Amino acid sequence: MIAIQLPDGSRREFDGPVTVAEVAASIGAGLAKAALAGRIGTGDAARLVDTSHRIEADEALSIITAKDAAGLDVIRHSTAHLLAYAVKELFPDAQVTIGPTIENGFFYDFSYKRPFTPDDLAAIEKKMGDLAAKDEPVVRSVMPRDEAVSYFKSIGEAYKAEIIESIPADQAVSLYAEGKFTDLCRGPHVPSTGKLKFFKLMKVAGAYWRGDHRNEMLQRIYGTAWATKDDLQKYLVMLEEAEKRDHRKLGRELDLFHIDEHAPGVVFWHPKGWTVWQQVEQYMRRVYRDNGYQEVKGPQILDKGLWEKTGHWDKYRDNMFTTESEKRDYALKPMNCPGHILIFKQGIKSYRDLPLRYGEFGQCHRNEPSGGLHGIMRVRGFTQDDGHIFCTEDQILPECDAFTTLLQKVYADFGFTEILYKVATRPEKRIGSDELWDKAEAALIASLRNSGCEFEISPGEGAFYGPKVEYTLKDALGRHWQCGTIQVDFSLPERLDAEYVAESGERLHPVMLHRAILGSLERFIGILIEEHAGALPFWLAPTQVSVLNITDGQADYARDVARSLQKQGLRVALDLRNEKITYKIREHSLQKVPYLIVVGDKERASGAVAVRARGNQDLGVMALEAFSQKLAAELAT
């Protein structure tokens, strides 16, 4: 007898070995039809298997359907294979390489003699639909490694053969076949192609084989797949909205910034964009000042010797911009922490000085691959609201407490109220005692509980030198942006000989808390632009008020109105052009200015202004003083 333990605690017994599909069928016809895979085992030992997997001994089993996150991943992985199947049917000379799942979808890389066209993409998607409609079984088999290499070479799949050759010779490999197509894969996969109904191919892009620019450029076809037609449609609508909000598009239309071929991955800020930058920076500077941070500034270029001590020279050198001068090697800093330790080390520090909080708008450079650059969201030169707290072990909890509370307020001020929290705990390879890790992890978890946060724990995902909390924003489109972090570091102060004098007179290494709220200011501003679709909150808008005259007869009055508002500290544009007022209103509305003031003869005669708010709201005519008070009140909230 074989006993199967189900998630609801019930047990089912079978006379002998049984497949996942057979267990599902024993529960009900509906579950048998919906089953996509199974999860056997519990805890860290649990693993996903095909519905054809035979269970030979007592086991815990969960049936995976499209309602489960794991089920959606199985659908997407299987759809990637369906894509490769369709490509091979239409373009037999194409070679398949790899096809993993990614967020919201999948991709597959192909080697082919010419670029795939939009018409090709449409034909491939249609072929995928035809193959899915045939509802062909997806069959798993196992083959010795060398035999698998020979098989793929025999059918002209050199890339697959190369992948398999990198697997140890004594390991067997699993293959999945659907119709005439066979692919290498760990699995699991859906039981038949008929389970794959709701998908769409999105685009074609270039990708180097194995991510190495010295290798052949392949063609990467991206797609998305979902459990239901409604889910697919919602996702496609979200993508349409995201395209309208694309910060690169809005950056051009609103004249905020540009990226130039002469400096790939570095931002050229235009006057309006730099105004937004300054508002963000000045806000964060007040945050530093009001929360006990001392602002510092370190050099951008530092000697190689420092990076050797920190370990970056060995592990991160390929991502650093380096130079040489007078037979000394230097690097542009990719991060600010070593510089802050050098500042901490100047002069003797006592336990009475701790916690010591440094903050910097630190400009960093990282040599990101050109293919990964994306507007101002993924750049090579960026500025961080980077802070480091030097403290004792007992101060970790109160500092983490204060930081989480502060971060929540900052995000709310920028319009973000949905935050996801994740605690990354100790990895297997780490430094520091278990007692110290216990204290640090407990402090991070307690700080989130004290703030009333729901959070998830990611076991083993902390750095070797300490655990961390990641703070992720959820935007108006439901997308996630990981921005903030607080990272406990037991290592770097010791590596760079940072010490303080304890109450006992003993010299100790401080604990270092790396913390950022916005992360990269460039990226955060990109997120803000997309979150607000370019219509930034009044306090952030590069132009807050535009003053428009109807005819030349009101030009002097319009100047007086603009001057009065500017004296109030507002950012005002004055448009005295000899154009129709409807044209001027439309042009400034497209620039997403929060308030437009129109002045004609009536307004001039009464000392009033006609006010239009963003979104085509007519607020009517009001006294200039009343309008000024309204804006002052809005800024005060």
From Swiss-Prot:
<dbReference type="InterPro" id="IPR002314">
    <property type="entry name" value="aa-tRNA-synt_IIb"/>
</dbReference>
<dbReference type="GO" id="GO:0004829">
    <property type="term" value="F:threonine-tRNA ligase activity"/>
</dbReference>
<keyword id="KW-0862">Zinc</keyword>
<comment type="subunit">
    <text>Homodimer.</text>
</comment>
<dbReference type="InterPro" id="IPR012675">
    <property type="entry name" value="Beta-grasp_dom_sf"/>
</dbReference>
<keyword id="KW-0547">Nucleotide-binding</keyword>
<dbReference type="GO" id="GO:0006435">
    <property type="term" value="P:threonyl-tRNA aminoacylation"/>
</dbReference>
<dbReference type="InterPro" id="IPR004154">
    <property type="entry name" value="Anticodon-bd"/>
</dbReference>
<dbReference type="Pfam" id="PF02824">
    <property type="entry name" value="TGS"/>
</dbReference>
<feature type="domain" description="TGS">
    <location>
        <begin position="1"/>
        <end position="65"/>
    </location>
</feature>
<dbReference type="InterPro" id="IPR006195">
    <property type="entry name" value="aa-tRNA-synth_II"/>
</dbReference>
<dbReference type="GO" id="GO:0005829">
    <property type="term" value="C:cytosol"/>
</dbReference>
<dbReference type="Pfam" id="PF03129">
    <property type="entry name" value="HGTP_anticodon"/>
</dbReference>
<keyword id="KW-0648">Protein biosynthesis</keyword>
<dbReference type="GO" id="GO:0046872">
    <property type="term" value="F:metal ion binding"/>
</dbReference>
<keyword id="KW-0820">tRNA-binding</keyword>
<dbReference type="Pfam" id="PF00587">
    <property type="entry name" value="tRNA-synt_2b"/>
</dbReference>
<comment type="similarity">
    <text>Belongs to the class-II aminoacyl-tRNA synthetase family.</text>
</comment>
<dbReference type="InterPro" id="IPR018163">
    <property type="entry name" value="Thr/Ala-tRNA-synth_IIc_edit"/>
</dbReference>
<feature type="binding site">
    <location>
        <position position="388"/>
    </location>
    <ligand>
        <name>Zn(2+)</name>
    </ligand>
</feature>
<keyword id="KW-0030">Aminoacyl-tRNA synthetase</keyword>
<dbReference type="InterPro" id="IPR002320">
    <property type="entry name" value="Thr-tRNA-ligase_IIa"/>
</dbReference>
<dbReference type="InterPro" id="IPR004095">
    <property type="entry name" value="TGS"/>
</dbReference>
<dbReference type="InterPro" id="IPR047246">
    <property type="entry name" value="ThrRS_anticodon"/>
</dbReference>
<dbReference type="InterPro" id="IPR045864">
    <property type="entry name" value="aa-tRNA-synth_II/BPL/LPL"/>
</dbReference>
<keyword id="KW-0067">ATP-binding</keyword>
<dbReference type="InterPro" id="IPR033728">
    <property type="entry name" value="ThrRS_core"/>
</dbReference>
<feature type="binding site">
    <location>
        <position position="337"/>
    </location>
    <ligand>
        <name>Zn(2+)</name>
    </ligand>
</feature>
<dbReference type="GO" id="GO:0000049">
    <property type="term" value="F:tRNA binding"/>
</dbReference>
<dbReference type="InterPro" id="IPR012676">
    <property type="entry name" value="TGS-like"/>
</dbReference>
<keyword id="KW-0694">RNA-binding</keyword>
<dbReference type="InterPro" id="IPR036621">
    <property type="entry name" value="Anticodon-bd_dom_sf"/>
</dbReference>
<feature type="region of interest" description="Catalytic">
    <location>
        <begin position="246"/>
        <end position="537"/>
    </location>
</feature>
<keyword id="KW-0963">Cytoplasm</keyword>
<feature type="binding site">
    <location>
        <position position="514"/>
    </location>
    <ligand>
        <name>Zn(2+)</name>
    </ligand>
</feature>
<keyword id="KW-0479">Metal-binding</keyword>
<dbReference type="InterPro" id="IPR012947">
    <property type="entry name" value="tRNA_SAD"/>
</dbReference>
<comment type="function">
    <text>Catalyzes the attachment of threonine to tRNA(Thr) in a two-step reaction: L-threonine is first activated by ATP to form Thr-AMP and then transferred to the acceptor end of tRNA(Thr). Also edits incorrectly charged L-seryl-tRNA(Thr).</text>
</comment>
<protein>
    <recommendedName>
        <fullName>Threonine--tRNA ligase</fullName>
        <ecNumber>6.1.1.3</ecNumber>
    </recommendedName>
</protein>
<dbReference type="GO" id="GO:0005524">
    <property type="term" value="F:ATP binding"/>
</dbReference>
<keyword id="KW-0436">Ligase</keyword>
<dbReference type="Pfam" id="PF07973">
    <property type="entry name" value="tRNA_SAD"/>
</dbReference>
